[in-house]
UniProtKB/Swiss-Prot annotation:
Pfam families: MscL. It comes from Burkholderia ambifaria (strain MC40-6). Channel that opens in response to stretch forces in the membrane lipid bilayer. May participate in the regulation of osmotic pressure changes within the cell. GO terms for cellular component: plasma membrane. This is Large-conductance mechanosensitive channel. Disulfide bonds: none annotated. InterPro entries: Mechanosensitive_channel_CS, MS_channel, MSC/AndL, MscL_channel. The lineage of its organism: Bacteria, Pseudomonadati, Pseudomonadota, Betaproteobacteria, Burkholderiales. It comes from the Bacteria.
Amino acid sequence: MSIIKEFKEFAVKGNVMDLAVGVIIGGAFSKIVDSVVKDLIMPVIGVLTGGLDFSNKFVLLGTIPPTFKGNPDSFKDLQAAGVAAFGYGSFITVAINFVILAFIIFLMVKFINKLRKPEEAAPAATPEDIVLLREIRDSLKQR
């Protein structure tokens, strides 16, 4: 069997196609979760915390150079200028994304496992020798 033919069988018959579909759907689903967190959850958290915007929360680790022309309160401007800053707000947003995504995947796996539960097996057929012995017993009882 040629290597190309073996690869075709592997790619088509194996789990490679399932994995590819999963990765594509996962990428699209992650964008949905990002939007839910960014556009729905974080604004509510911002309102509950008095207008706090997590995406721009950081701790300055270095000094701002005198030639810096951006906004010193903007994490993105500081990053673009190469200033060392610890962006914990961005991390909080990503952590919330992860928790939501992990929970949704957990629910999906749980649902799929529930669908996969095997139906209770019908009782196994009685072996022929047992059936024969019962017939003999019943026949002897009748005499």
